[in-house]
Amino acid sequence: MAQDQNVPLVATSPPRKRRRPPKSCDPCRRRKVRCDRKFPCGQCERARTALQCNYAPIVTASSPSGGDISHLAAPSVREGDSPPSEPADPQRPSRPSAHSSHLLPPEQHQSQNKIIQNLQRRIRRLEDQLPYPATSRTTTGPDSDVSQAQALRHLHDRVLLTEEQWSDFSQPNNLVNGWAIPAIQPRLRVTPDKTKVFGPSHWLHTAEKFQVLGKFDAKEVEPSLQGVDSRSEVAGILKDCRHLRQTMKAQESVRLNHPVPDILSTLPTQEVCDSLVDAYLRTFELIYRIVHIPTFWEDYRRFWTQPQSTSTHFLMQLVLILALGTIFYSDRSKRVNLRRLAHTWIYAAQWWLVGPSEKSTVNLEGLQVGCLLLLARQTNILPTTSWLSVGSVLRMAMVMGLHRAPDLFPALSEYQSEMRVRLWVTVLELTLLSSLDASMPLPFSLQDIDCMAPSNLDDEQFGPKTERLPRPQPSERLTESSIQILLHKSLPVRVEAVRLLNNQHRQELSYETALRLGTELRSACRDVAALFDTARNQSRHVTPSSKMAPFHLRFIDTYLRRYILFLHRPFMIQARKDPRFYLSRKVCLDSCVVIASYADHLRLPSDNLDDLSHLAIVGRGSFKGALSFDVIISLGLEIITQLEEEASTRPSGSSPPFVADHLDKMAKANRVPLIRSLEHIQEQLLQIIALGNPSLKRYNFLCAILSQIRAMESGQPIQPAIYATIKESLLKCYTLLKASHAASSPQESVESLTTGPDSLPDFDVDALDPALGLEIPSLLFFPGLMDMSGTEW
């Protein structure tokens, strides 16, 4: 009976109709648009959602074969999303069977390979973010010659294991201070004219949870017409709204005349431009990595064949590079005119960067122009507030997300990632430089930065079309990035040094900390010497290391020793009355002697100058090198301190000439090289004034220092000697400036004086009589003590 009841139930039940399997991909089915059934389909490619294109598997009665992987689910992890905390759904749609990959056209097969590589990189990023080493890391990734079926199977295994580990990790942990959740990862928007990062507190991370908005694309957050049927009514309305919006914004914008409407007409001949570009690339570019050299040369050659079709951002890069190249141009007959043109180019680039087109410059090209602009203003005798300007460039870089690790943004190409890292390190270096020179706090914290160091690669090893960066060279192999990597190694120490020096709320300056940082910076100087020693040893080979020049060694050595000088200078001053800090006197003296020695190559009025000498003539702040005020006053103070110590050992009431014992004679002999170094700097500063550069403070102050030293050595009254010296030095300055101004027309002048050519007043040297009660600081033009705002220091 039971058998009679059971058999008919199965035999008589009507056959269940099987649902027709879908042929369109899942995104097209959701959007209800026609799918061309390719992989990825045309609709998904136009909507920039190629990675989300997937097809439902065709379920058959037989079990899948070894090569069929259509039953596997490969969930997509979008950029910036938290990893899924739930296990993979076995009913979730997946990619088409890998059996069909060999039947696809070559371009589609290549597209699938790119998708697999992209997924591998994104899964690797998820594994790296695990709080403990992922088990899947021990599994070697598939080689490039394996089938797509094997590659996808390998990815499937890694996805399942990573999801399981993330699921365990994403469960709230009962911590001491409460409950914790995974940090929200940033999102990056990259469009042709703008790059922007969306931080953890941005509304985007909440808005994307609304299903009505759908999934945001990794590259473009705003709605796009590419995801809407252009024949629909919605698409037409959206087009009209966007067009009207752009029209209204154009009407409201202020139309200003460009200060240099035809910048192409200001460029010199191609031969001169070639020389200027080469001068920049052989000097600054190897220290501050800004451009990709092969790409720049390609654009540069294209510019001379099709100048009218050149993009504006490349034109701005070019004119700033030319402006930086004028520093090292040796032809004096053309140098004056090129310097004037350099000022024109700098103002034009600044207008483009922060003028009406400011919003469209927030991208890598705009940031490159910003970095070049900072360097150009620092080296062309232009009035500048570098600390304010570099703060804007720093914030621009952070808005673009350069301070975050590129691995967080898998939509970036390998070329973009590496260039972002290089540019970010350059921005940090320029920011650190400006804070040190301006004696202001740093506007960033290393705790907010997780960007890695640049790769040790030559520019020829990768480019915009590179899909995968080659393996970085060993550290002992010198490349075009070796100098930047070496500077990046000492970056944390220098950041701590600037924070210690410019801490606005400190009560005390720790001597132990200063000693520790000074020792680490001294070690960094040795690393620099070792790097260039390696470069010299490898110079017999045809390698990029041959591009390293003495300019780079002297520039970086001067730069690092300034940190040592600044760290110990407060204790050097204190050591004049507290001998416990005598070591700081010695450290400051050693640093100044090394820096001042680099001025030996500066031999004005000769034209045979090296690159560092050319830079010292026109540079600002740290770029003045041996001619900086810091070196002058530190050396002068050490000599005067030694003379004061000698005077304190003489019997009271003794009068000149003083009797010198053997120790006094040895001390005087040791001071002779220091005094000669200051006298050489004094002569070079006077020659710079003769070139038409109205930089007066350093020269006149050094004249006063040397006058005091001579008076103390001879036992003569100090104040009358200083007044007489200042009278003579000011008269020299006035004579040289007047001659330089008369010889230059307004169109040819490098720096015109504030008064007209016929309105220069006569200089009354008798006004400098000490009986008039004028203070020496006032005679030396110190700010706040005398109104000399029109004079350039």
Curated annotation (Swiss-Prot):
One of the record's GO molecular function terms: zinc ion binding
Region called Disordered, residue ranges: 1-29, 60-113, 457-476
PROSITE patterns (UniProt xref): ZN2_CY6_FUNGAL_1, ZN2_CY6_FUNGAL_2
Compartment list: Nucleus
UniProt KW keywords: DNA-binding, Metal-binding, Nucleus, Transcription, Transcription regulation, Zinc
GO cellular component, one term: nucleus
The keyword Iron belongs to this UniProt entry's keyword annotation: no
Role summary: Transcription factor; part of the gene cluster that mediates the biosynthesis of oxopyrrolidines, polyketide-amino acid hybrid compounds with feature structures of tetramic acid.
SMART domains: Fungal_trans, GAL4
Lineage: Eukaryota, Fungi, Dikarya, Ascomycota, Pezizomycotina
Gene Ontology terms: biological process: DNA-templated transcription
PANTHER family membership: ASPYRIDONES CLUSTER REGULATOR APDR-RELATED, HEME-RESPONSIVE ZINC FINGER TRANSCRIPTION FACTOR HAP1
Pfam families per record: Fungal_trans, Zn_clus
Top-level taxon in the UniProt lineage: Eukaryota
Major place of residence: nucleus
Disruption phenotype: Does not affect the production of oxopyrrolidines A and B.
Transmembrane domains' residue ranges: none
DNA bind region: 25-53
Protein name: Transcription factor opdR
